From Swiss-Prot:
Keywords: Cytoplasm, Initiation factor, Protein biosynthesis
Subunit structure, as described in the record: Monomer.
Lineage: Bacteria, Bacillati, Bacillota, Bacilli, Lactobacillales
Protein name, entry field: Translation initiation factor IF-3
Compartments in which it is found: Cytoplasm
The keyword Protein biosynthesis is annotated on this UniProt entry: yes
One Pfam family of this chain: IF3_C
SUPFAM superfamilies: Translation initiation factor IF3, C-terminal domain (SSF55200), Translation initiation factor IF3, N-terminal domain (SSF54364)
Length: 176
């Protein structure tokens, strides 16, 4: 059953149809009833009559405690939002002529990002005439990928974009 916002559901006196297909508290079919009789049944049970499918012929109405239903629905939505994980892309910038110590520092940062579950975009910016030696940049990226292969997979291979070469790494998904 698709649940919609309050403004889309008609409750009790807001329902403006002659007869409805009535569904009971436990989900049992009570048949097609005139609206006044359905409202009386809901009032006797001290709960609400909610029109859940106005497009059906005849429209479907359910007897339920709307406040409790709304609370449960919001609780479910909140749980689903908690389960969603936000993946961010962190960037590590390198140079084609990077020194070993600097490379190790950048590598350590990249590994830290990957261990936290973030994706890492490794980029190399070519300045001046360095652009003529793209193979040096590709070699640096390959070295970075190889150094992180135990915790990451290459999501996007090295590619040029203007004066920049980049690749994207993603953490290896947990095997469950």
């Amino acid at each position: 059953m698709k649940i919609i916002a309050k403004k889309d559901l008609f409750i009790n006196d807001e329902i403006r149809v002659r007869e409805v297909r009535l569904v009971g508290l436990e989900g049992e079919q009570l048949g097609i009833k005139p609206l006044s009789e359905a409202q009386a049944i809901a009032d006797d049970a001290n709960v609400d009559l909610v029109l859940i499918q106005p497009q059906a012929t005849p429209p479907v109405a359910k007897i339920m405690d709307y406040g409790k239903f709304k609370f449960e629905y919001q609780k479910k939505q909140k749980e689903q939002r908690k389960k969603q994980s936000v993946v961010t892309v962190k960037e590590v910038r390198l140079s084609p002529v990077i020194d070993k110590g600097d490379f190790e520092t950048k590598l350590r940062n990249g590994r830290k990002f990957l261990e936290k579950g973030n994706k890492v975009k490794v980029s190399i910016r070519f300045k001046g005439r360095m652009i003529t030696h793209k193979e040096i940049g590709a070699k640096v990226l390959a070295e970075f990928a190889e150094a992180t292969q135990d915790i990451a997979i290459i999501e996007q291979r090295a590619k040029m974009d203007g004066r920049q070469m980049f690749m994207q790494l993603a953490p290896i998904p947990d095997k469950k």
